[in-house]
Amino acid sequence: MSSMRTHYCGLVTEQLIGQEVALTGWVQRRRDHGGVIFIDLRDREGLVQVVCDPDRPEMFKAAEEIRNEFCIRITGKVRPRPAGTENANLTSGKIEVLCHELTVLNPSVTPPFQLDDDNLSETTRLTHRVLDLRRPQMQYNLRLRYKVAMEVRKYLDAQGFIDIETPMLGKSTPEGARDYLVPSRVNPGHFFALPQSPQIFKQMLMVSGFDRYYQITKCFRDEDLRADRQPEFTQIDCETSFLTEQEIRDLFEDMMRTVFKNAIDVDLDAKFPVMEFREAMARFGSDKPDLRVKLEFTELTEVMKDVDFKVFSGPANSDNGRVVGLRVPGGGAISRGEIDAYTQFVAIYGAKGLAWIKVNEVAKGRDGLQSPIVKNLHDAAIAEILKRTGAQDGDIIFFGADKAKIVNDAIGALRLKVGHSEFGKSTGLFEDTWKPLWVIDFPMFEYDEEDARWVAMHHPFTSPKDEHLQYLETDPGKCIAKAYDMVLNGWEMGGGSVRIYREDVQSKVFRALKINDEEARAKFGYLLDALQYGAPPHGGLAFGLDRIVTMMAGADSIRDVIAFPKTQRAQDLLTQAPSTVDEKQLRELHIRLRAQEPKTTA
């Protein structure tokens, strides 16, 4: 294998009994047992037990001095472990290595934590990331990430895709998330932007005739971070020419099935279900529904229009209001304390409260219900609620009534909270499996109340459905896009669309977004020009590599599948980035910092 070692520690098995081996690695733990020293030696493949006998005084003296995380090399003979001392949890658990020679390659200061401590704070882990990455789970996560990327490349290469790099330094187009800006030293007052995606470049590669493109690349967005977001993230970016929307979806659905099978031996559905955006929002309040949770919304807006209860009738009679019920089978067993906790939970999403009805006996109608709101509802409304929700004895119905967005967010989050709870799992409301689906037919635009204009729901290069082209100039809100998202267990794995490939249509979309011809030419003139040279029909999508690996690894955060991630404050605790820079560097970039204005208190 090399002059320093013959095998990886974790790969020494009973097949090597009787053989001499040379091993290198780190001391996981050292134990003294009755004059014999045992060392758990670790490398990236796992652990092996090394036995140091005092019969070899020089070696034994070295073994007495080693401590956790010392980097060492040993030579010795593989032998079976004594009966009753085998460790079934280790690949090397049936053997041990009797040490002949031991060399300390490099000692270690006392580590700030034990590598097998499962209760470390994330701050500690990220500050000492070099040590954190030695932990078996992190080694597994990053090797899984490599395997997923390799499987993606193998699949796309076999399908005739070409890996082409696109620029990291590009032009700022302030649509969507904030750009990370890079000042140009040689062009004073001018800035590059780090790419939020290679979107326009990959479209131009289709115009250039490359037909099938991909790259696994870094993208950058200066936005507020959550558990599934990073300022820099890795995208599996793909684009194709001369394929229909259905053909694009079929191709990448097959890719994802292949990658899951080869990377973690999981068989995803032979055919992913397809759901329109409108249906997903109606049933689940989300465009990325977690289908493992067997709870759905019941639409009650019409039912509540004439009730004498403003909490329900107000939103029901509002243009952008919505009233829904969420029936939880067996939820009558949920305690008042748990209901209060759920009420506080939905408040995070803007809900002003959480109305509920416990169904004790359906047959008794009003008299069989338990809730402070029942007195505010007339008999016809109660009957319709029970009928539409399909309520049974022992159920609870939660209600959301507010602006549609608040209802969707709050009750959608409550649906997941209940489904993933111990109650949900123990009562069959949660199915522990893989549930992929496509969400299609997104609105082309959504209305921005603050700016009083239409904005692109995905991006302004998404094609509207052919029969909706007429609405671009008359009623943009009616436009449905040829857009699609692949969703898995409530996470958006990837998303894309068929693109606009005609310059006249692209210009109409810009105008619908209140981007006039002059502004469009200044920002996107190079794309508009390219589309005039016989641009082919094309489309594609991009997958989030970080998210895919996070799901496969069962990790809590994408920070657990990235070697050196940023915190939720976009900081690297290991290197202390971002940092201040020298005044000289700022002068070279023609930049002067303004002092921050002091915060005033009322």
Curated annotation (Swiss-Prot):
- The principal localisation class reads cytoplasm
> Which InterPro entries has this protein been placed in?
Aa-tRNA-synt_II (IPR004364), aa-tRNA-synth_II (IPR006195), aa-tRNA-synth_II/BPL/LPL (IPR045864), Asp-tRNA-ligase_1 (IPR004524), Asp-tRNA-ligase_1_N (IPR047089), Asp/Asn-tRNA-synth_IIb (IPR002312), AspRS_core (IPR047090), GAD-like_sf (IPR004115)
Recorded superkingdom: Bacteria
Gene Ontology CC terms: cytoplasm
Molecular function via GO: aspartate-tRNA ligase activity; aspartate-tRNA(Asn) ligase activity; ATP binding; nucleic acid binding
* Record field: catalytic activity: tRNA(Asx) + L-aspartate + ATP = L-aspartyl-tRNA(Asx) + AMP + diphosphate
* Pfam families the UniProt entry points to: GAD (PF02938), tRNA-synt_2 (PF00152), tRNA_anti-codon (PF01336)
Q: Where does L-aspartate bind?
A: 175, 221, 458, 499
Region of interest (Aspartate), residue spans: 199-202
- Record's SUPFAM superfamilies? Class II aaRS and biotin synthetases (SSF55681), GAD domain-like (SSF55261), Nucleic acid-binding proteins (SSF50249)
**What EC numbers are recorded for this enzyme?**
6.1.1.23
Compartments (UniProt record): Cytoplasm
Q: Which residues bind ATP?
A: 221-223, 230, 492, 544-547
Keywords, comma-separated and alphabetical:
Aminoacyl-tRNA synthetase, ATP-binding, Cytoplasm, Ligase, Nucleotide-binding, Protein biosynthesis
Indicate the annotated site residue(s) for Important for tRNA non-discrimination. 33, 84
Which CDD domains does the entry mention? AspRS_core, EcAspRS_like_N
Task: Name the family.
Answer: Belongs to the class-II aminoacyl-tRNA synthetase family. Type 1 subfamily.
Function, in words: Aspartyl-tRNA synthetase with relaxed tRNA specificity since it is able to aspartylate not only its cognate tRNA(Asp) but also tRNA(Asn). Reaction proceeds in two steps: L-aspartate is first activated by ATP to form Asp-AMP and then transferred to the acceptor end of tRNA(Asp/Asn).
This protein is called what? Aspartate--tRNA(Asp/Asn) ligase
Q: Please tell me the species this chain comes from.
A: Cupriavidus metallidurans (strain ATCC 43123 / DSM 2839 / NBRC 102507 / CH34)
Q: Which gene encodes it?
A: aspS
